[in-house]
């Protein structure tokens, strides 16, 4: 077998530096890390349910992003493991100078882990 260990090591080191998972993100939220959570799904899906504290930045809003920070890590997520919206948004936002990471697995994985979800009813009760 011809395997390039050096390239593989670089690939996984880079991947680990710029991605997170639901468990890690929940830990960041619990520790009140100085991050911005960015949901890049369609607005209707965002309104229905989202990661608590997330802002919505759907495709079409990436060129002039509102609510992001160039001083904080912006953690992006989309629908599911097959969705590429978060990585597309990451590329666009990086080009504008925003530090980003992607939560792998998307919102469906967040829910599958039993992580907290914010919904209109939950938001209304919390207010």
PLM regions and their residue ranges:
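Flexible, polar/low-complexity N-terminal or interdomain linker segments that lie immediately upstream
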Residues: 1-36, 43-45, 119-127
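Terminal peptide-recognition signature
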Residues: 39, 54, 93
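Catalytic cysteine-centered active loop of the rhodanese-like fold, especially the PTP/DSP P-loop
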Residues: 63, 68-111
